[in-house]
């Protein structure tokens, strides 16, 4: 073979041949986005996560205006999100529970991650930090769209909860045809 070719099997009892390597394309629908600034979350209310900065979006299918991703190509997709949440106000700021949702076409598709932390003995004024992360494989058509929502409940409604910019991300890519 020559540079750029791979040895390909032609089946049992048939000699293999060298063919031009395939796969790997810059046109495969994919994106990765993150928060552009810390995002305050209302206590005990589902909140859409505003992923306003994109690392990349092949085909321009991620909207930093609507904070949603539309694949644009039918197929099976790996979809993943990670949220890093911080609270303050000591015991009152400790997470009672939290959930991260994947919405498809404006409705909840699944709970990607659930959080039920334990009382970690924080004192007043200390910060609690928790991570929600999850992934799913879903079949999408060309016009489906996906969004991430988060629900966080602290012990009292007075505690503030913010999503951190550094590790809070939303990403997806095509893994195969429908």
Q: In which residue ranges do the predicted regions lie?
A:
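Extracellular repetitive beta-rich solenoid segments
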Residues: 1-28, 65, 73, 94, ...
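Predominantly extracellular/luminal regions of secreted and cell-surface proteins
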Residues: 25-52
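Short, surface-exposed tryptophan/glycine-enriched loops
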Residues: 121-145
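Short, acidic Gly/Pro/Ser/Thr-rich loop/turn segments
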Residues: 14, 40, 86
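Solvent-exposed serine/threonine-rich low-complexity stretches and specific carbohydrate-binding patches
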Residues: 110-123
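Beta-rich globular "head" domains
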Residues: 32-35, 53-108, 135, 146-149, ...
């Amino acid at each position: 073979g020559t540079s750029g070719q791979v040895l390909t099997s032609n089946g049992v009892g048939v000699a293999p041949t060298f063919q031009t390597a395939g796969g790997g394309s810059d046109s495969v629908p994919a994106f990765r986005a993150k928060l552009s600034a810390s995002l305050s979350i209302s206590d005990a209310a589902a909140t859409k996560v505003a992923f306003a900065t994109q690392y990349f979006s092949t085909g321009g299918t991620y909207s930093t205006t609507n904070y949603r991703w539309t694949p644009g190509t039918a197929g099976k997709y790996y979809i993943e999100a990670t949220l890093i949440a911080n609270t303050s106000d000591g015991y009152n700021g400790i997470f009672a529970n939290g959930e991260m949702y994947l919405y498809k076409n404006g409705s909840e598709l699944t709970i990607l991650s659930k959080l039920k932390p334990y009382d970690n003995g924080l004192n007043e004024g200390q910060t609690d930090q928790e991570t929600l992360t999850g992934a799913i494989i879903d079949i999408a058509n060309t016009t489906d769209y996906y969004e991430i929502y988060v629900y966080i409940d602290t012990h009292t409604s007075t505690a503030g909860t913010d999503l951190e910019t550094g590790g809070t991300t939303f990403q997806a890519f095509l893994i195969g045809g429908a």
